[in-house]
Amino acid sequence: MDDFKLDKPTPYYLQFYNQLKKMIFNGTFKPGERINETQLAKSFGVSRSPIREAMRLLEKDGLLKADDRNGFSITSLTAKDVDEIYKIRIPLEQLAVELVIDEADEEELTILEKQLEETEKAIHNGTEDTEIIRLNQKFHELLVDFSHNRHLKNLLEHVNDLIHFCRILNYTGDHRAETILREHRRIFEEVKKKNKEAAKQHVLAHFNHDCEHLKHVLEEGKEN
């Protein structure tokens, strides 16, 4: 906590919300770990009130779960969670690629292609996983941005944190970065050709592969 400094103009609970989310995503807190509100308040040197408000927001995002002792623990994804998240995500991102084909201009397509090239370069250079994950996340964000549909973007933002949770787990295993990049390229090639049905099928195949891999990772976690 030593590197965390309060920014007075921003409400404290929002600062703690962002900091705690970062700590969940970087593995400081592990899935299933119980969060001690009093201990966090002491560590940050504040009252419990802004910590409690931050934790309520994280519960709303699906990153924390209330327990039967009036506390919270870090969400542990289940196979059912993965199914439910991707049942939302697949049709929305299929719609996104359709809209990109209709709405995106040449400059935006070039940005998408450069994003894939940057990811490939990072993988080749042995860049750490957190950066590869960020670059691949950016590809999906650009697809949604270039759909030019703010309501679609808002819908995806409601489940964005849980999607990111899945994305971190999805990079467990050998050659996952290369596999995911290859699937992203297939989607982009069909977008460039303006082939809506093929682009949607590649989105479906990509996410089906993700689901299968995530369930395998979760099953292995149970066994270990």
From Swiss-Prot:
DNA-binding region boundaries: 37-56
Transcription regulation found in the keyword field: yes
Keywords: DNA-binding, Transcription, Transcription regulation
Gene3D superfamilies hit by this protein: GntR ligand-binding domain-like, Winged helix-like DNA-binding domain superfamily/Winged helix DNA-binding domain
InterPro entries: AsnC-type_HTH_dom, GntR_C, TF_FadR/GntR_C, Tscrpt_reg_HTH_GntR, WH-like_DNA-bd_sf, WH_DNA-bd_sf
SMART domains, A to Z: FCD, HTH_GNTR
HTH gntR-type domain: residues covered: 10-77
Listed CDD domains: WHTH_GntR (cd07377)
Disulfide pattern: none
Keyword match Transcription: yes
GO molecular function: DNA-binding transcription factor activity; sequence-specific DNA binding
One Pfam match: FCD
Name the record gives this protein: Uncharacterized HTH-type transcriptional regulator YdhC
Species of provenance: Bacillus subtilis (strain 168)
Lineage of the species this protein comes from: Bacteria, Bacillati, Bacillota, Bacilli, Bacillales
